[in-house]
A protein has these predicted regions:
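Extracytoplasmic/secreted proteins, especially bacterial periplasmic and envelope-associated proteins
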Residues: 1, 15, 19-35, 84, ...
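Acidic/histidine-rich, surface-exposed loop or edge segments in extracytoplasmic proteins
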Residues: 1-10, 68, 109-110, 168-173, ...
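A non-catalytic alpha/beta surface segment that caps or lines the substrate-entry region
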Residues: 1-59, 203-205
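Sec-exported extracytoplasmic/periplasmic mature domains
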Residues: 3-11, 25, 29-34, 93-101, ...
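Structural recognition of the beta-strand scaffold that forms the well-ordered cores
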Residues: 37, 51, 63-67, 106-109, ...
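A mature extracytoplasmic/lumenal domain signature
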Residues: 39-41, 56, 68-72, 109-111, ...
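Acidic/histidine-rich catalytic neighborhood of metal-dependent amide-processing enzymes
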Residues: 73-188, 211-214
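Active-site-adjacent substrate-binding region
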Residues: 141, 148-277
Protein backbone atom coordinates (compact mmCIF):
# COMPACT_ATOMS: atom_id res chain seq x y z
CA UNK A 1 0.00 0.00 0.00
CA UNK A 2 2.60 2.58 1.02
CA UNK A 3 4.98 1.98 -1.89
CA UNK A 4 2.65 0.49 -4.48
CA UNK A 5 -0.33 2.83 -4.15
CA UNK A 6 0.75 5.93 -2.21
CA UNK A 7 4.34 6.10 -3.44
CA UNK A 8 6.73 8.94 -2.64
CA UNK A 9 5.77 10.49 0.71
CA UNK A 10 7.52 13.45 2.28
CA UNK A 11 7.06 17.15 2.96
CA UNK A 12 7.20 17.88 -0.79
CA UNK A 13 4.57 15.21 -1.48
CA UNK A 14 2.49 16.26 1.48
CA UNK A 15 -0.80 14.76 0.35
CA UNK A 16 0.82 11.35 0.01
CA UNK A 17 2.55 11.75 3.38
CA UNK A 18 -0.78 12.46 5.04
CA UNK A 19 -2.44 9.54 3.24
CA UNK A 20 0.33 7.30 4.57
CA UNK A 21 -0.24 8.54 8.12
CA UNK A 22 -3.96 7.94 7.77
CA UNK A 23 -3.41 4.45 6.37
CA UNK A 24 -1.18 3.56 9.31
CA UNK A 25 -3.75 4.97 11.75
CA UNK A 26 -6.50 2.93 10.12
CA UNK A 27 -4.47 -0.28 10.26
CA UNK A 28 -3.69 0.21 13.93
CA UNK A 29 -7.34 0.94 14.67
CA UNK A 30 -8.37 -2.20 12.80
CA UNK A 31 -5.97 -4.14 15.03
CA UNK A 32 -7.84 -2.92 18.09
CA UNK A 33 -5.78 0.06 19.19
CA UNK A 34 -6.53 3.72 19.63
CA UNK A 35 -4.23 5.34 17.08
CA UNK A 36 -2.76 8.58 18.39
CA UNK A 37 -0.84 11.29 16.61
CA UNK A 38 2.02 13.38 17.91
CA UNK A 39 1.85 16.41 15.64
CA UNK A 40 4.36 19.19 15.09
CA UNK A 41 4.55 21.95 12.50
CA UNK A 42 7.20 22.40 9.84
CA UNK A 43 7.02 24.81 6.90
CA UNK A 44 3.53 25.74 8.16
CA UNK A 45 2.33 22.16 7.70
CA UNK A 46 1.37 19.67 10.43
CA UNK A 47 3.46 16.50 10.46
CA UNK A 48 2.63 13.44 12.53
CA UNK A 49 4.20 10.51 14.27
CA UNK A 50 1.53 7.81 14.61
CA UNK A 51 1.41 5.69 17.76
CA UNK A 52 -0.50 2.77 19.25
CA UNK A 53 0.01 1.72 22.86
CA UNK A 54 -0.38 -1.65 24.52
CA UNK A 55 -0.48 -0.74 28.20
CA UNK A 56 1.64 -2.86 30.47
CA UNK A 57 0.45 -4.64 33.59
CA UNK A 58 2.90 -5.02 36.46
CA UNK A 59 5.65 -2.77 35.02
CA UNK A 60 3.59 -0.35 32.94
CA UNK A 61 5.90 2.61 33.60
CA UNK A 62 8.69 0.80 31.74
CA UNK A 63 8.32 1.21 27.99
CA UNK A 64 9.39 -0.75 24.93
CA UNK A 65 9.22 1.15 21.62
CA UNK A 66 8.97 -0.57 18.24
CA UNK A 67 9.30 2.02 15.48
CA UNK A 68 9.81 2.57 11.76
CA UNK A 69 9.78 5.67 9.60
CA UNK A 70 7.12 5.98 6.91
CA UNK A 71 8.52 8.85 4.83
CA UNK A 72 10.73 8.53 1.74
CA UNK A 73 13.33 10.56 -0.08
CA UNK A 74 12.20 12.55 -3.10
CA UNK A 75 11.47 10.49 -6.20
CA UNK A 76 11.42 7.18 -4.35
CA UNK A 77 8.36 4.98 -3.63
CA UNK A 78 10.23 3.47 -0.68
CA UNK A 79 9.23 -0.19 -0.72
CA UNK A 80 12.24 -1.42 1.20
CA UNK A 81 13.08 1.97 2.69
CA UNK A 82 10.87 1.88 4.56
CA UNK A 83 7.47 0.40 3.79
CA UNK A 84 9.02 -2.93 4.80
CA UNK A 85 9.75 -1.61 8.28
CA UNK A 86 6.28 -0.09 8.64
CA UNK A 87 4.68 -3.35 7.51
CA UNK A 88 6.62 -5.16 10.22
CA UNK A 89 5.50 -2.68 12.88
CA UNK A 90 1.87 -3.07 11.81
CA UNK A 91 2.08 -6.87 11.75
CA UNK A 92 3.73 -6.99 15.16
CA UNK A 93 1.15 -4.59 16.57
CA UNK A 94 -1.59 -6.88 15.28
CA UNK A 95 0.04 -9.93 16.87
CA UNK A 96 0.31 -8.27 20.27
CA UNK A 97 -3.16 -6.72 20.23
CA UNK A 98 -5.13 -7.72 23.31
CA UNK A 99 -2.17 -9.38 25.01
CA UNK A 100 -1.01 -8.73 28.54
CA UNK A 101 2.67 -7.88 28.89
CA UNK A 102 4.40 -6.54 32.02
CA UNK A 103 5.95 -3.56 30.24
CA UNK A 104 4.10 -1.08 28.05
CA UNK A 105 4.74 -1.52 24.32
CA UNK A 106 4.43 1.42 21.94
CA UNK A 107 4.23 0.84 18.21
CA UNK A 108 5.25 4.03 16.41
CA UNK A 109 5.50 5.18 12.79
CA UNK A 110 7.86 8.15 12.52
CA UNK A 111 7.83 10.96 9.99
CA UNK A 112 10.85 12.84 8.59
CA UNK A 113 13.61 10.29 8.96
CA UNK A 114 14.99 10.98 5.51
CA UNK A 115 17.22 13.91 4.45
CA UNK A 116 17.17 16.86 4.79
CA UNK A 117 15.69 16.20 8.24
CA UNK A 118 17.88 13.22 9.10
CA UNK A 119 19.71 13.71 12.42
CA UNK A 120 18.14 17.13 12.99
CA UNK A 121 15.59 18.43 15.49
CA UNK A 122 12.91 18.10 12.77
CA UNK A 123 13.31 14.33 12.53
CA UNK A 124 10.06 12.78 13.76
CA UNK A 125 11.84 10.34 16.04
CA UNK A 126 13.87 13.20 17.54
CA UNK A 127 10.66 15.05 18.36
CA UNK A 128 9.30 11.85 19.88
CA UNK A 129 12.41 10.90 21.87
CA UNK A 130 12.91 14.43 23.20
CA UNK A 131 9.29 14.57 24.36
CA UNK A 132 9.73 11.20 26.07
CA UNK A 133 12.84 12.45 27.85
CA UNK A 134 11.07 15.68 28.89
CA UNK A 135 8.22 13.64 30.41
CA UNK A 136 10.67 11.39 32.19
CA UNK A 137 9.52 8.29 30.29
CA UNK A 138 11.42 5.16 31.28
CA UNK A 139 12.27 3.56 27.95
CA UNK A 140 13.66 0.07 28.51
CA UNK A 141 14.56 -0.33 24.85
CA UNK A 142 13.78 0.94 21.37
CA UNK A 143 13.92 -1.10 18.14
CA UNK A 144 14.14 0.79 14.86
CA UNK A 145 12.95 -1.39 11.98
CA UNK A 146 14.82 -0.08 8.95
CA UNK A 147 14.74 -1.70 5.51
CA UNK A 148 13.94 -5.35 6.19
CA UNK A 149 13.04 -6.86 2.85
CA UNK A 150 16.05 -7.52 0.59
CA UNK A 151 18.26 -10.62 0.68
CA UNK A 152 20.75 -12.22 -1.69
CA UNK A 153 22.67 -15.49 -1.82
CA UNK A 154 25.30 -14.06 -4.18
CA UNK A 155 28.88 -13.86 -2.98
CA UNK A 156 29.93 -10.24 -2.74
CA UNK A 157 26.37 -8.98 -2.35
CA UNK A 158 27.09 -7.60 1.12
CA UNK A 159 29.30 -4.62 1.89
CA UNK A 160 30.21 -2.85 5.14
CA UNK A 161 31.63 0.39 6.49
CA UNK A 162 35.42 0.36 6.24
CA UNK A 163 35.87 0.08 10.02
CA UNK A 164 34.27 -3.37 10.14
CA UNK A 165 34.92 -4.64 6.61
CA UNK A 166 36.15 -8.21 6.61
CA UNK A 167 34.63 -9.05 10.00
CA UNK A 168 31.28 -10.26 8.68
CA UNK A 169 30.01 -12.40 5.76
CA UNK A 170 30.05 -11.05 2.21
CA UNK A 171 26.73 -12.73 1.34
CA UNK A 172 23.70 -10.58 2.07
CA UNK A 173 21.32 -13.28 3.26
CA UNK A 174 20.99 -12.19 6.91
CA UNK A 175 19.19 -9.65 9.06
CA UNK A 176 21.37 -7.32 11.10
CA UNK A 177 21.04 -6.10 14.68
CA UNK A 178 23.13 -2.96 15.28
CA UNK A 179 23.60 -0.89 18.43
CA UNK A 180 25.98 1.56 20.00
CA UNK A 181 28.18 0.39 22.84
CA UNK A 182 25.84 1.76 25.50
CA UNK A 183 22.99 -0.42 24.19
CA UNK A 184 24.89 -3.71 24.09
CA UNK A 185 22.73 -5.36 26.77
CA UNK A 186 19.61 -4.67 24.72
CA UNK A 187 21.28 -6.07 21.60
CA UNK A 188 22.46 -9.25 23.32
CA UNK A 189 19.03 -9.88 24.80
CA UNK A 190 17.39 -9.32 21.42
CA UNK A 191 19.87 -11.64 19.73
CA UNK A 192 19.21 -14.45 22.20
CA UNK A 193 15.45 -14.17 21.81
CA UNK A 194 15.61 -14.03 18.01
CA UNK A 195 17.79 -17.12 17.79
CA UNK A 196 15.57 -19.06 20.18
CA UNK A 197 12.61 -18.47 17.87
CA UNK A 198 14.09 -18.88 14.40
CA UNK A 199 17.13 -20.17 12.55
CA UNK A 200 17.02 -17.24 10.12
CA UNK A 201 20.57 -15.91 9.61
CA UNK A 202 21.41 -13.08 12.01
CA UNK A 203 24.52 -10.94 12.37
CA UNK A 204 24.87 -8.46 15.22
CA UNK A 205 27.25 -5.70 16.21
CA UNK A 206 27.56 -3.30 19.13
CA UNK A 207 30.04 -0.73 17.87
CA UNK A 208 30.98 2.93 18.30
CA UNK A 209 28.25 5.22 17.03
CA UNK A 210 30.77 7.19 14.98
CA UNK A 211 31.15 4.36 12.45
CA UNK A 212 29.28 5.34 9.25
CA UNK A 213 25.93 3.61 8.94
CA UNK A 214 25.59 2.64 12.60
CA UNK A 215 23.30 5.56 13.41
CA UNK A 216 21.44 5.77 10.12
CA UNK A 217 17.87 5.47 11.34
CA UNK A 218 15.49 6.48 14.10
CA UNK A 219 17.37 4.69 16.88
CA UNK A 220 19.90 7.52 16.63
CA UNK A 221 17.37 9.95 18.12
CA UNK A 222 16.90 7.71 21.14
CA UNK A 223 20.65 7.49 21.67
CA UNK A 224 20.74 11.28 21.77
CA UNK A 225 18.03 11.23 24.44
CA UNK A 226 20.02 8.74 26.51
CA UNK A 227 17.89 5.68 25.85
CA UNK A 228 19.04 2.17 24.86
CA UNK A 229 18.16 1.55 21.23
CA UNK A 230 19.14 -0.63 18.29
CA UNK A 231 18.48 -0.95 14.58
CA UNK A 232 17.10 -4.03 12.84
CA UNK A 233 18.08 -3.88 9.17
CA UNK A 234 19.03 -5.68 5.98
CA UNK A 235 21.79 -3.01 5.94
CA UNK A 236 20.07 -0.91 3.23
CA UNK A 237 22.78 0.88 1.14
CA UNK A 238 25.37 -1.73 2.02
CA UNK A 239 23.31 -4.37 0.19
CA UNK A 240 20.27 -2.98 -1.62
CA UNK A 241 21.02 -1.91 -5.22
CA UNK A 242 17.95 0.34 -5.47
CA UNK A 243 18.47 2.32 -2.27
CA UNK A 244 16.98 5.82 -2.54
CA UNK A 245 16.00 5.40 -6.19
CA UNK A 246 12.76 5.29 -8.17
CA UNK A 247 13.29 1.53 -8.49
CA UNK A 248 12.78 0.83 -4.77
CA UNK A 249 9.54 -0.95 -5.62
CA UNK A 250 7.56 -3.81 -4.02
CA UNK A 251 8.69 -6.41 -6.57
CA UNK A 252 12.26 -6.20 -5.22
CA UNK A 253 11.38 -7.58 -1.78
CA UNK A 254 11.56 -11.12 -0.44
CA UNK A 255 8.32 -11.47 1.49
CA UNK A 256 8.97 -15.00 2.71
CA UNK A 257 12.21 -13.99 4.37
CA UNK A 258 10.61 -10.84 5.74
CA UNK A 259 7.97 -13.04 7.39
CA UNK A 260 10.69 -15.09 9.10
CA UNK A 261 12.31 -11.91 10.40
CA UNK A 262 8.98 -10.72 11.81
CA UNK A 263 8.55 -14.07 13.58
CA UNK A 264 11.93 -13.58 15.22
CA UNK A 265 11.11 -10.00 16.18
CA UNK A 266 7.93 -11.16 17.87
CA UNK A 267 10.11 -13.23 20.19
CA UNK A 268 12.42 -10.26 20.75
CA UNK A 269 9.53 -8.08 21.87
CA UNK A 270 8.19 -10.82 24.12
CA UNK A 271 11.59 -10.97 25.78
CA UNK A 272 12.13 -7.24 26.20
CA UNK A 273 8.58 -6.72 27.49
CA UNK A 274 9.34 -8.96 30.47
CA UNK A 275 11.94 -7.53 32.88
CA UNK A 276 14.93 -9.76 33.59
CA UNK A 277 13.93 -12.47 31.10
Amino acid sequence: MLAGTIGERNLWSYGALERAAQYISTQLTTSGYTARRQTFDLAKLPLSNVEAVLEGTTRAAEIVIIGAHYDTVAGCPGANDNASGVAAVLELAQRFSGQSQPRTIRFVAFVNEEPPFFQTAHMGSAVYANAARSRGDRVAGMLSLESLGYYSEEKGSQRYPAAIAGLYPDVGNFIGFVSNLASVRLLLRARRAFRRRTSFPLQSAAVPAAIPGVGWSDHWAFWQAGYPAMMVTDTAPFRYPWYHTADDTPDKLDYDRLAHVIDGLEAVIESIAVPNR
